[in-house]
């Protein structure tokens, strides 16, 4: 609720005006097309993907970057990039570090592709409060 998505939607709205092509990876499945239109986003020219899991989202990002066809890719949000194993697993199963490993591996691959392209990628993340923190900042990313 601090305006991260709104800020990126302004970038998404401006890129086509400058001749750029844009993709929005809506991992949260929460993009409001009407709100985006009010901010100036051309929904008809926007490449929109609502992937089923983290692996699918990151594979789409990698493919789009390697295509060289886009100027901007927004991924909303890192916290919603849930690994396939966690989605398909049983309630209560331990998936310690699974998302961190997925992100680490994918970012190495995507960063390499980004370095060889003209594409900008914006990954949105969320701050959460750590429960029971006595010292230091209680905020953490997920």
Swiss-Prot record:
Signal peptide: none annotated. Keywords: ATP-binding, Cytoplasm, DNA damage, DNA recombination, DNA repair, DNA-binding, Nucleotide-binding, SOS response. It is found in: Cytoplasm. Pfam families: RecA (PF00154). ATP binds at residues 1-5. This is Protein RecA. Belongs to the RecA family. Gene3D superfamilies: P-loop containing nucleotide triphosphate hydrolases. One of its GO terms (cellular component) is cytosol. The gene is recA. GO terms for biological process: DNA recombination; DNA repair; SOS response. It comes from Streptantibioticus cattleyicolor. PROSITE patterns: RECA_2. The keyword Nucleotide-binding applies. Can catalyze the hydrolysis of ATP in the presence of single-stranded DNA, the ATP-dependent uptake of single-stranded DNA by duplex DNA, and the ATP-dependent hybridization of homologous single-stranded DNAs. It interacts with LexA causing its activation and leading to its autocatalytic cleavage. One of its GO terms (molecular function) is single-stranded DNA binding.
